[in-house]
């Protein structure tokens, strides 16, 4: 019987609530499909700072490195915003990405037919949307050096560096090509090459790598136009390839196509070693403990972990089917309420999904 080691980072806010549902799902699937899961929970984010004065303790990172996959819920809380930057929960995410060399972030954006009425977009605009954002994750302006703050007399100055080398761009392009070859063989690379030298290198490198592929359709788009096109006609996109900063922004914009950011999973991957699978949404401390959070993005992230991280394809598909069945029966959490459905709590919608497996 196959055995997998999974590290759970339930984190902060609504994290423990949505994690509990995913763990129950995993336990049921492991029995159904005949594999063993060794699930070890570790401190991460704000809770890790409270316990260890570090949002990403060495023990946690070591356990993640030794695992087959990492399942992460969410981190953060406004109460940590006054801490030094390196102690904030969000800094833990950057440390985790660096420690595991997670250079590729994969965010699928797919509209479920039963949720067409829950989106703020018109039905005819989004009904065929099925795209993937491939975002470079450990380069660009979030990691570039030098960075910092300077005080000159009474004037404060802050600066960051947006930097990529051709190797970083090549490897993320290869990930996008691999995904595109399994889909429509169509990639839209997003940059700002009309004003940024780093974006010109991005465009040149992506074009060079893509030119070696047969039957691959590559287009280029400036990021401001890409944002407009995602709202105007999101169905035109299949695989969007972009840098760290632009991907962060565009993927959240694309999230609203689905009706709620509570519907979007993601995977962060390296060339070797474990990936991290997490919902796109934040920790939502304002609703933590109220049992009203949407656990579906976490469940879909669990599905991605099974499919990509553990190669348990049937088990992964089982989650997707269960979620579609629950939604098609009119069950929703409050963030998806369109006035014509049965609103359930976080635990209730989780139980419905578990029953469908």
Swiss-Prot record:
N-terminal signal peptide: none
Entry keyword annotation includes Ion transport: no
Any Pfam family: Iso_dh
UniProt keyword annotations, A-Z: Amino-acid biosynthesis, Branched-chain amino acid biosynthesis, Cytoplasm, Leucine biosynthesis, Magnesium, Manganese, Metal-binding, NAD, Oxidoreductase
InterPro entries xrefs: IsoCit/isopropylmalate_DH_CS (IPR019818), IsoPropMal-DH-like_dom (IPR024084), Isopropylmalate_DH (IPR004429)
Essential cofactor(s): Mg(2+); Mn(2+)
EC number of this enzyme: 1.1.1.85
Gene Ontology cellular-component annotations: cytosol
Pathway stated in the Swiss-Prot or TrEMBL entry: Amino-acid biosynthesis; L-leucine biosynthesis; L-leucine from 3-methyl-2-oxobutanoate: step 3/4
Compartments, record wording: Cytoplasm
Domain of life the protein comes from: Bacteria
One example GO MF annotation: NAD binding
Reactions that this protein is recorded to catalyse: (2R,3S)-3-isopropylmalate + NAD(+) = 4-methyl-2-oxopentanoate + CO2 + NADH
Swiss-Prot/TrEMBL GO biological process terms: L-leucine biosynthetic process
Record's keyword annotation contains NAD: yes
Binding site for Mg(2+): 224, 248, 252
The protein's role, per its UniProt record: Catalyzes the oxidation of 3-carboxy-2-hydroxy-4-methylpentanoate (3-isopropylmalate) to 3-carboxy-4-methyl-2-oxopentanoate. The product decarboxylates to 4-methyl-2 oxopentanoate.
HAMAP family with a match to the protein in the record: LeuB_type1
Family (UniProt): Belongs to the isocitrate and isopropylmalate dehydrogenases family. LeuB type 1 subfamily.
Protein name: 3-isopropylmalate dehydrogenase
Gene: leuB
């Amino acid at each position: 019987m196959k055995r997998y080691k999974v590290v759970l980072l339930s984190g902060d806010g609504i994290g423990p609530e949505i994690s509990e549902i995913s763990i129950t799902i995993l336990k049921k699937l492991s029995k159904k499909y005949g594999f063993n899961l060794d699930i070890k929970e570790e401190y991460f984010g704000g809770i890790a700072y409270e316990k260890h004065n570090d949002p990403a303790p060495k023990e946690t990172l070591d356990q993640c490195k030794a695992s087959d996959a990492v399942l992460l819920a969410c981190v953060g809380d406004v109460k940590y915003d006054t801490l030094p930057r390196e102690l904030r929960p969000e800094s833990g995410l950057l440390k985790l990405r660096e420690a595991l060399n997670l250079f590729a972030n994969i965010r699928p954006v797919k509209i479920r037919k039963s949720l067409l009425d829950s989106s703020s977009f018109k039905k005819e605009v989004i009904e065929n949307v099925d795209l993937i954002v491939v975002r470079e994750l450990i380069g660009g302006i979030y990691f570039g050096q030098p960075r910092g703050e300077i005080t000159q007399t009474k004037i404060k100055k802050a600066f960051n560096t947006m930097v990529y080398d051709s190797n970083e761009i090549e490897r993320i392009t290869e990930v996008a090509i691999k995904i595109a070859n399994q889909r429509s063989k169509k990639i839209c690379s997003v940059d700002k090459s009309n004003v940024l030298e780093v974006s010109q290198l991005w465009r040149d490198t992506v074009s060079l790598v893509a030119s070696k592929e047969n039957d691959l359709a590559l287009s280029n788009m400036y990021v401001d136009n890409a944002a407009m096109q995602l709202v105007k006609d999101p169905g035109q996109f299949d695989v969007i390839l972009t840098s760290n900063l632009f991907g962060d922004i565009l993927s959240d914009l694309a999230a609203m196509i689905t009706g709620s950011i509570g519907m979007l999973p993601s995977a962060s991957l390296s060339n070797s070693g474990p990936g991290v699978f997490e919902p796109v949404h934040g920790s939502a401390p304002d609703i933590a403990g109220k049992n009203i959070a949407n656990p579906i993005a976490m469940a879909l992230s669990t599905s991605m972990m099974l499919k990509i991280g553990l190669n348990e394809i049937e088990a992964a598909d089982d989650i997707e089917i269960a979620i579609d069945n629950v939604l098609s029966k009119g069950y929703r959490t409050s963030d998806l309420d369109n006035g014509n459905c049965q609103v359930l709590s976080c635990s209730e919608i989780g139980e419905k999904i578990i029953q469908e497996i």
